[in-house]
């Protein structure tokens, strides 16, 4: 299923439109996950669940991790096909910290520079919305993802070990990238849980 959503259009990346998805877009998002299972197989050791898209709209950070808003963003090409998605949390843990929970590009577009250009558009939009730093987690050993984020200018600040993700127990590298005049030390002074010595989950 491919159809442009009726929700709010956030920004464009060339001929690709980025839309703020809503619960009415669950079928097209679930179809996208099923057609592009690589992320779920690598991180969770299993294909996407039958309610994977639904969980993207319902999952929330723990109570001790305050946030402003969750955006589930769909990237649609000029033919109305969903070619990528991102889940973004604004002002997580502190003002100016934007967290990327998921960023998945259709497997058929891997190696073509599509992910890099879509991420650049996403980062620019986040900056316009007040992002000072972008934060995300990458599973240690998922070399493709690690290389991608490092090439985008992200640096590891800490590791979270022993996390149960689906069928697998993983170590997650917490990556941060300053996207304003505020640097990494400013970030670490503000977000205590991401300091290298932190024992917080």
Residue ranges of predicted features:
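Short hydrophobic/aromatic beta-strand or adjacent loop that forms the aromatic wall/cage
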Residues: 70, 170-174
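Short, solvent-exposed loop/turn elements at beta->coil junctions and helix N-caps
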Residues: 89, 160-164
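Acetyl-CoA-dependent GNAT
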Residues: 4-110, 119-121, 125, 178, ...
């Amino acid at each position: 299923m491919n159809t442009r959503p009726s929700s709010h259009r956030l920004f464009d990346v060339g001929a690709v439109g980025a839309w703020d998805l809503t619960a009415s877009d669950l079928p097209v998002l679930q179809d996208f996950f099923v057609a592009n299972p690589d992320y779920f197989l690598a991180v969770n050791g299993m294909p996407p669940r039958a309610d994977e898209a639904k969980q993207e709209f319902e999952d929330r950070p723990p109570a001790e991790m305050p946030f402003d808003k969750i955006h589930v963003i769909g990237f649609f090409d000029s033919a109305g096909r969903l070619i990528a998605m991102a889940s973004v949390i604004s002002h997580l843990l502190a003002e100016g910290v934007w967290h990327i929970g998921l960023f998945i590009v259709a497997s058929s577009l891997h190696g073509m520079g599509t992910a890099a250009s879509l991420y650049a558009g996403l980062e620019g939009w986040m900056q316009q919305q007040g992002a000072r730093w972008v934060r995300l987690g990458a599973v240690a050993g998922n070399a493709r993802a690690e290389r991608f984020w490092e090439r985008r200018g992200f640096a590891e600040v800490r590791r979270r070990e022993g996390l149960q993700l689906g069928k697998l127990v993983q170590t997650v590298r917490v990556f941060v990238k300053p996207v304003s005049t505020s640097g990494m030390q400013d970030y670490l002074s503000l977000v205590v849980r991401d300091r290298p010595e932190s024992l917080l989950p």
